């Protein structure tokens, strides 16, 4: 995503964009296990079983199967289970869109979105509380405020404003693990 069109600067090439990048793309099995153990202790449960819904074709099949095999190895096979439920893309989409009416309609799934490379701030609309096709449980007035400032704020065209807001929105989603970024650019 280009954050500075005049100078051709990509968001990831800025200090702000690099701040949300983690060594080994954030893959840290020891930290994952530690945080998982803390979550189990905090909630008073000893095992988690999740069902992932995914498209029955394409890369989601192999990636979902990989996660099913590897997450229990990282988190503890006696403490974590990932069940898989494949379905046609349209059915999965319908099920996810039903979230507003039935928050228990799915537990974990792949999400896909696209955005123009020239407006990275707009790519975050999917996590606003008011997005019309919302299909996940993240609601944050603070996030909405930052998104609105990046898109509609009086100072949005001032140097560095959108850069900081994009970095802030990204951090607000990644740090609490609202999303686990997996990128695939099919157009390049």
Language-model segments: residues:
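Short helices/loops that flank or line small-molecule/ion binding pockets
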Residues: 65-76, 90-106
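Extracellular/periplasmic catalytic domains that process cell-envelope and extracellular macromolecules
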Residues: 43-46, 100-104, 141, 173-175
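Extracytoplasmic/peripheral linker and loop segments enriched in polar/acidic and small residues
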Residues: 1, 16-28, 78-94, 120-188
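Paired acidic/hydrophobic, glycine-rich loop segments that form the ligand-binding mouth/hinge
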Residues: 103-111, 181
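Short beta-strand/turn micro-motifs at beta-sheet edges
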Residues: 39-42, 109, 135-136
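Append "and occasionally in soluble cytosolic enzymes with long acidic Gly/Pro-rich linkers
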Residues: 1-73, 168
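Solvent-exposed loop/turn segments at secondary-structure junctions
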Residues: 56-60, 89-90, 113-118, 187-188
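Short, well-ordered beta-strand segments
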Residues: 51-53, 109, 183
